[in-house]
Amino acid sequence: EPFQASQLDQMIQQDDSIYRVFDPQEGLNGARTSYFHKSVGGYHAAKPRALQNLFEYHLYQNNLQVMNMLNVKYVIQQDDEGNSYPAVNPDANGNAWFVDQLVPVSSANEEILKLKDFNSKTQAVVNTKEYPELTKLRYSVDSVASIDLVDYRPDYLKYSSNNSNDGFAVFSEMHYPSGWNAFIDGKPQDHYKVDYALRGMKVPAGQHEIEFKFEPEVVETGSQITLAANILLGLIIVGGLGFTLFRGKKEES
């Protein structure tokens, strides 16, 4: 193994909920943290530009609201003797939540700057120039409204939601429109980039099942090409066998 689990890693791993870990000493490209935990930077060396900007403008500046919206539950700190320990962030937003206000901006620059002075638990910043259909800016969130992550896989996420009113939910996952499709109760649903990098979605009142599926077009196209090639190959084989049998019978006669 490239790394050995420390006592600190073992302490964090005792928490079996879904959260993220941030080690300021490692920063965006911390391989060790990603090896043992779900780190903010992820395990892949190539990082989305939006995530890089969040680190540069907010995480490195200790913006707690951004840490909360990224569901950072543990921050690796050092004590006076230089020993690392996991500091618990009790205010992490969790995997998804309902907000009662959309804060409109008109550019990506305004969007990332607005994260300096917003409340990530009750507000979501949206670029209304990019999404002019988001005209409703106020939502009612009752005290029992909930949205829970019930299935978590690299290419599939499922949530269970319950809200007395039509709502707007924010999901602590990077917005990546090229492949991720959203569904509510099995029906396709639009989702939006909010808070500069996350996913947002309008959710109707009541109890619902929300799914995100990674279905990139390149994979679908490749699968279709593979299927067509296999069918063509099968036809060639069948045709070849038919021709061989026909020629054999002709020679016998």
Where is each model-derived feature located?
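Active-site-proximal, structured, solvent-exposed surfaces of multi-pass membrane proteins
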Residues: 122, 126-253
